[in-house]
């Protein structure tokens, strides 16, 4: 899901 991808993107920023 796109939502999961968004969460992964945020986690990558951290």
Swiss-Prot record:
Keywords: Amidation, Amphibian defense peptide, Secreted
Domain of life: Eukaryota
GO cellular component: extracellular region
Known tissue expression: Expressed by the skin glands.
Bilayer-spanning residue ranges: none
Location of the protein in the cell: Secreted
Modified residues (Leucine amide): 14
One GO-annotated biological process of the protein: defense response
Stated family: Belongs to the frog skin active peptide (FSAP) family. Brevinin subfamily.
Biological role stated in the UniProt entry: Lacks antibacterial activity against Gram-positive or Gram-negative bacteria.
Protein name (database record): Fallaxidin-3.2.1
Organism, scientific name: Litoria fallax
């Amino acid at each position: 899901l796109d939502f999961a991808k968004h969460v992964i993107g945020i986690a990558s920023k951290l």
